[in-house]
């Protein structure tokens, strides 16, 4: 299953929503898509009855989802994301490869890390690694989703990073130790 969620702040045009929908359909993979009520510049996505009928056996649409629970589910094989920092870390910890589509702020850098740094997925960007300004076609989306969902290299890499993040978080790990050190420094300064 491909989990699709573009965060709480990204807005997408109606034409782009249609291209995403058709790209997901053409990929052939089952998907769970969080379609926020205001994600189309204040409007809700309005999918055609024909589209909904064609994908009804392998698509599920919700306006909110418990992201950590979904990413932790064993049936989730990929995450189509805006590449926000929290979503990126949650996916890595859960061991889920990502297809990043950055919009603004930290997202272009995060998506560059996803694809080029950590090699735990792919991203959609222009030649300068800037967010895309133009319409992305269903064919590009289909191709990227297929590559994400069928390539073992992303799953292998994200599993390595997931294990590292878990080790860092447990007692004696680097993140755990840094957190405890931070708490102690706060206690010593009234």
Regions found by a protein language model. Name each.
Residues 1-190:
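Catalytic core of nucleotide-sugar-dependent glycosyltransferases
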